[in-house]
Regions:
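P-loop NTPase nucleotide-binding/switch module
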Residues: 91, 99, 119-168, 181-186, ...
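Glycine/charge-rich, flexible interdomain linkers and switch-proximal surface loops
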Residues: 24, 106-107, 245, 317
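Acidic-enriched and Gly/Ser
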Residues: 2-11, 18-22, 31-153
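A broad, low-specificity signal for short, low-complexity segments enriched in glycine/proline
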Residues: 1, 12-15, 35-39, 130-135, ...
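Short, charged, intrinsically disordered terminal tails
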Residues: 1-14, 444-456
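P-loop NTPase catalytic core
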Residues: 160-161, 167-456
Length: 456
């Protein structure tokens, strides 16, 4: 791990000094409507993204984020309940450092909230030397490294049919109740990486502890930082959880490490952004989503990937897996369509496959890794191509076979598909705790296809 140079530390201190608000800037609450608090007296002092401290009755206070301006008033969304807030109460502008995180290696093994505070009852988090803005820009495209070698995800269906590379971004698309969370847990436990950063955005509260103790386990947690914003938290915190998690991942990537970033789910991030946009007065457009939602998506997703090119062995990578909960199993709904256009590949989970009892229910014919060709050997490409062809032909002929309309021996290619297809299906079936290396997965596919699957 490289130590930060003295000049970098001095530069960071200078940035912190520039961001300090020299005097206490105060305003007052004008109105409270829905989720929005309108604040007067901050013109020229507060900007979008700044944080405020709202003082309610009985000396209680709650933080809020400025999300827009209207008629000279700052529109703020609180990080907590609105109870006790009313017109005339005092508002203070917090220093710009409130929008940064001082991440350190001591965060490994910890559970963190969207504001960078510990949630696991193990005391405060150790702070790093360099505060990072949570709304940082992605690395410049011309200075970014290229994708690295392939990474073992530990799930055969993905390692074979959507082979992933270091720095690649994959989306896991699924309807509700299809098995997305199960696959997410398998990947969190089995994927090979130096550090895992896991964002649970809008999850049910009861599922968080189950994930930490049953799915991740002590060994998995030791190499991970988990950022949690449950479904009952305000939308501004649910959205911030994703940015906080990405900021943590960037800290470890900039050290030259291989980081696995996992987020469940992008859909709930977009729903939170929709609540914020509509509350700020944005007009709804596609299916009720305001334009800002589709502007936020690339700003977040593009931050994952390779870091700056520092040469072999020194470049860090954020390999990202984003889950997308599609509405009504419609993979072309606005969020799914936008995410699929940004990412480097997609894994489609199919309800019919799940109902047949095969888990994980990955539809290998509809799943794709755009970067796989750059990390497969000629023999492996042939194996995958043949396996896809067999699965496609078996799927095409399934109805005719069930009806008894196909007579064995009529077509050698169909006969081969009907013979080898069940072997591939068996290969794709995997228990939650079962792990397979990349080499073992390809060897299992060779054995399933038999001699005909090998290059001539």
């Amino acid at each position: 791990m490289r130590r930060n140079s003295l000049s970098e530390k001095i530069g960071a201190c200078g940035a912190m000094l520039r961001d300090i608000t020299p005097l206490t800037v105060s305003g007052r609450i004008v109105s409270v409507s829905g989720l929005v608090v309108d604040v007067a007296g901050l013109a020229g002092q507060a900007f979008v993204g700044d944080q405020l401290l709202l003082y309610g009755r009985d000396d209680a206070s709650v933080r809020a984020e400025v999300v827009g301006f209207h008629d000279g008033l700052a529109q703020a969304l609180p990080f907590g309940p609105l109870n006790g807030l009313g017109p005339g109460q005092t508002v203070s502008l917090l220093p710009r450092s409130a929008g940064t995180l001082a991440v350190s290696d001591g965060w490994l093994g910890r559970v963190v909230d969207p504001l960078g505070r510990a949630m696991d009852g193990r005391g405060p988090l150790p702070l790093g030397l360099l505060p990072r803005p949570i709304a940082a820009a992605p690395p410049e495209a011309t200075h970014r490294a290229r994708l690295g070698d392939r990474i073992a995800l530990g799930v055969r269906a993905l390692d074979l049919f959507t082979t992933c590379r270091l720095g690649q971004r994959l989306g896991l698309f699924s309807g509700s109740g299809v098995g997305k969370s199960t696959l997410f847990a398998m990947l969190a436990r089995a994927a090979v990486c130096d550090v895992a950063v896991i964002a649970l955005v809008g999850e049910r509260g009861r599922e968080v502890r189950e994930f930490l103790e049953d799915d991740l386990g002590p060994e998995g947690l030791a190499r991970s930082v988990v950022i949690v914003a449950t479904s009952d938290t305000p939308p501004v915190l649910r959205r911030r959880a994703a940015y906080t998690a990405m900021t943590v991942a960037e800290h470890f990537r900039d050290q030259g490490r291989s980081v696995l970033f996992m987020m469940d789910s992008v859909t709930r991030f977009c729903l939170a952004a929709r609540e914020i946009g509509l509350s700020a007065g944005e007009p709804p457009s596609t299916r009720g989503y305001p334009p800002s939602v589709f502007a936020d998506l690339p700003r977040l997703l593009e931050r994952a990937g390779p870091g700056k090119d520092k040469g072999p062995g020194a470049t860090g990578f954020i390999t990202a897996l984003f889950t997308v909960l599609v509405e009504g199993d419609d993979t072309n709904e606005p969020v799914a369509d936008a995410v699929r256009g940004i990412l480097d590949g997609h894994v489609m989970l199919d309800r019919r496959i799940a109902e047949s009892g095969r888990y994980p229910p990955v539809d290998v014919l509809r799943s794709l890794s755009r970067a796989a060709q750059g990390c497969l050997t000629a023999e492996e490409r042939l194996l995958i191509r043949r396996a896809r062809g067999i699965v496609a032909l078996q799927t095409e002929m399934a109805d005719l076979v069930r009806m008894g309309a196909y007579r064995p021996g009529s077509d050698p290619a169909v006969d081969e598909a009907l013979t080898l297809g069940p072997r591939i299906e068996s290969l794709l079936r995997q228990e939650r705790t079962e792990q397979t290396s990349l080499d073992a997965a390809f060897q299992m596919l060779r054995e399933a296809l038999g001699p005909a699957g090998l290059p001539q």
